[in-house]
């Protein structure tokens, strides 16, 4: 496994009225984060808060190219980001969620204390497969064929790239002591957005560069898990 120190390139926030960040997503223009009783959006170029949606937002947040998905207790809500209207609700895997990501037609749901990541059907909530971790899972993102998740245990947090078929840890970016990860998203390019829990901040972390050969060997989220 490759280990390195996380390169934090920018910090955003804290934002007015948002004391906690529990999930992060990116829609190509705005960063969205779960702030408890609201979904909040800000401009990653200026850092300026833009708008909020009144909806329970306690944990993971995801974007499928058109709609937002938000974890709230034991359910996942599909939201129109233009109107804020909840379009559909599906059950979340039992045990509480702590991360959410969209990947080529399915959702990945992280579970904090259960130390699991579930791939689920976004129409029904049915669990398609489960990956186990040896650390608390505090954020999930999928980008360029890579599955990453955040961890936060005691005073230590890291970003992990894992094999989506086996759960094997392939790479780790260690955050500085005391800097937590609560929510994780890729911008589709060279950085991650990491929620900062009760610091109320979102941090941009440089994503390791990789050649096309490495990317071409990545697994598809639809491939069956190995037992």
What are these language model-derived features?
Residues 1-17:
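A short helix->beta-strand "capping" segment at the edge of beta-propeller domains
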Residues 12-37, 59:
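Beta-strand-rich domains and repeat architectures in extracellular enzymes and scaffolds
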Residues 12-17, 52-56, 89-93, 130-134, ...:
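Surface loop/turn motifs at the tips and blade-to-blade linkers of beta-strand repeat domains
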Residues 26-28, 63-65, 102-104, 142-144, ...:
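Residue-level detector of Asp-centered blade-edge/turn motifs that repeat once per structural unit
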Residues 32-37, 68-74, 109-114, 149-154, ...:
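Conserved beta-strand positions in repeat-built beta-propeller and related beta-rich domains
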Residues 43-47, 80-84, 121-125, 163-167, ...:
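Short loop/turn segments that connect beta-strands within beta-propeller blades
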Residues 181-227:
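Blade-level signature of beta-propeller repeat domains, shared across WD40, Kelch, NHL, RCC1
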């Amino acid at each position: 496994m490759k280990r390195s120190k996380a390169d934090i390139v920018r910090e955003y926030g804290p934002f007015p009225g948002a004391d906690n960040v529990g999930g992060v997503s990116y829609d190509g223009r705005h960063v969205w984060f779960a702030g408890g009783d609201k979904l909040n959006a800000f401009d990653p170029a200026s850092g300026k808060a833009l708008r909020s949606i009144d909806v329970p937002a306690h944990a993971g947040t995801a974007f499928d190219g058109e709609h937002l998905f938000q974890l709230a207790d034991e359910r996942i809500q599909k939201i129109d980001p233009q109107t804020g209207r909840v379009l559909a609700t599906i059950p979340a895997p039992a045990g509480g969620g702590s991360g959410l990501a969209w990947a080529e037609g399915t959702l990945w749901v992280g579970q904090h204390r259960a130390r699991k990541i579930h791939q689920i059907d976004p129409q029904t909530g049915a669990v398609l497969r489960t990956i186990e971790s040896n650390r608390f899972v505090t954020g999930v993102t999928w980008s360029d064929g890579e599955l990453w998740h955040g961890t936060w245990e005691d005073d230590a947090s890291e970003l992990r790239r894992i094999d989506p078929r086996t759960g094997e840890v392939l790479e780790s970016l260690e955050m500085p002591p005391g800097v937590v990860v609560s929510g994780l998203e890729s911008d589709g390019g060279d950085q991650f957005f990491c929620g900062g829990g009760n610091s109320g901040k979102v941090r941009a972390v440089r994503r390791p560069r990789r050649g096309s050969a490495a990317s071409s060997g990545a697994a598809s989220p639809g491939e069956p898990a190995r037992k």
